[in-house]
């Protein structure tokens, strides 16, 4: 089923993301490494999963970031030691980000888009999720609802594994992270 899904290509509603690119882009290689990381997680090879996400980072950093959240949360759900390491990693990353924003290389890099900037990106309907029509919200958030419905069905049949639960929570964390960015999107804050 996963192989068949990879043959499909469609634009994810109101985003600039496609389920699969029609050409080879570094994002596709990073996605492949992320998919291998998920496979490693399913086989409880935690450090292999972490290494695969790390290798994906220089290939395409944002794709690797999404897999880091998915796999990182899943590993934290599965393993207490990984949960502690993950919590420490999040704290260290937040401190480094705060320092970089306050006095380091990111100081002053957050900018509010002005009218000229907004005109330049006006055709990019994917940039401002706060302007999405209701159907796009239903389609995009409905994917998470569908995931949890399928998870509930597998649980009811006794087919659910701990890895399934962990990945469902990882996917939920991705959606939560997206939702947390909405105030910045509404304020038209541009990231460096």
Q: Which residues fall in each region the model found?
A:
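Hydrophobic faces of alpha-helical transmembrane segments in multi-pass integral membrane proteins
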Residues: 2-4, 29, 33-34, 55, ...
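Hydrophobic alpha-helical transmembrane segments of multi-pass membrane proteins
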Residues: 25, 55, 134-138
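Transmembrane catalytic cores of multi-pass membrane glycosyltransferases
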Residues: 61-67, 76-192
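Membrane-helix interface segments
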Residues: 44-49, 81-84
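Membrane-interface alpha helices of multi-pass inner-membrane proteins
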Residues: 38-40, 47-61, 67-72, 90-97
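Membrane-interface micro-motifs in multi-pass membrane enzymes
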Residues: 1-41, 192
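Short, Lys/Arg-enriched charge-dense amphipathic segments
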Residues: 19, 72-78
């Amino acid at each position: 089923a996963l192989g068949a899904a990879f043959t499909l290509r469609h634009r994810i509603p109101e985003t600039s993301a496609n389920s699969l690119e029609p050409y080879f882009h570094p994002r596709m290689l990073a996605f492949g490494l992320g998919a291998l990381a998920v496979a490693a997680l399913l086989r409880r090879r935690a450090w292999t999963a972490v290494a695969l996400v790390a290798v994906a980072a220089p290939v395409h950093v944002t794709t690797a970031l999404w897999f880091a959240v998915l796999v990182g949360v899943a590993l934290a759900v599965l393993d207490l030691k990984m949960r502690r390491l993950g919590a420490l990693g999040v704290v260290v990353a937040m401190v480094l980000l705060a320092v970089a924003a306050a006095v380091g290389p990111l100081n002053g890099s957050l900018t509010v888009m002005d009218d000229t900037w907004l005109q330049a990106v006006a055709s990019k309907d994917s940039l401002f999720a706060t302007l999405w029509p209701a159907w796009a919200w239903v389609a995009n958030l409905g994917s998470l609802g569908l995931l949890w419905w399928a998870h509930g069905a597998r649980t009811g049949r006794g087919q659910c594994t701990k890895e399934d639960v962990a990945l469902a929570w990882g996917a939920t964390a991705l959606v939560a992270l997206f939702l947390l960015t909405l105030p910045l999107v509404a304020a038209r804050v541009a990231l460096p």
